[in-house]
A protein has these predicted regions:
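Short histidine-centered catalytic/ligand-binding loop motif
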Residues: 5-6, 63-71, 117-120, 124
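A generic structural motif
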Residues: 36-37, 101-107
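Short, internal acidic amphipathic alpha-helical interface segments
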Residues: 65-104
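Long, hydrophobic, amphipathic alpha-helical segments used as structural scaffolds
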Residues: 90-93, 97, 138-150
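Long, amphipathic alpha-helical coupling/dimerization segments that relay conformational signals between
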Residues: 108-142
Length: 167
């Protein structure tokens, strides 16, 4: 839980801001010069969160891994599910890494150069929380397709009905 003391940090370099944000939540994290990796809890699984800062482009790439590895024989149907899911998203997208079969959510944020590459706490919170929320929202779709015997369309319909019923 973030405290009023945590909100005193108004802006910092993107990796510094994410490091402070993760620390405030008590999440395990590993930091490198232009990269930070953290583990965040979710209701379905824990998420590995990776952020990579490309200073010369002023771009922060953010990845969330929902701990789903797709077997070769299920990839075609999962690609279809990813396409249907991505149609529902305004920001970011899901993809499947062909070399490893790992599913992930990817988003990139351009950090305004006028602020000398600084990221606000609000921007960090929005980036992290929106990635986790989308992973949580669509995790059941991928599970239904992979292990529940549903078609991608059936899985999406079932998952969206289930989430609409939650309070």
């Amino acid at each position: 839980m973030l405290t009023s003391q945590d909100h005193e940090i108004e802006a910092a370099a993107p990796i510094d801001m994410l490091d402070a944000y993760y620390a405030a939540h008590g999440w395990e994290r590993e930091r490198h010069e232009d990269e930070i990796i953290a583990t965040a809890p979710g209701s379905w699984t824990s998420y590995e969160l990776r952020a990579l800062w490309r200073e010369h482009d002023s771009v922060l790439q953010f990845l969330a891994f929902p701990d789903i590895k797709v077997p070769d024989d299920r990839r075609a149907s999962l690609y279809e599910a990813i396409g249907l899911v991505n149609e529902q998203l305004w920001i970011g997208h899901f993809e499947l890494w062909s070399s490893t079969g790992v599913l992930l959510f990817r988003h990139a944020a351009m950090i305004d150069g006028d602020e000398e590459g600084a990221m606000s706490l609000g921007a960090a919170e929005l980036l992290v929380e929106s990635a986790i929320e989308e992973c949580e929202r669509f995790y059941p779709v991928f599970q239904f397709v992979l292990w529940g015997g549903k078609s991608p369309k059936e899985a999406l319909a079932a998952a969206l009905v289930d989430t609409q019923g939650e309070a």
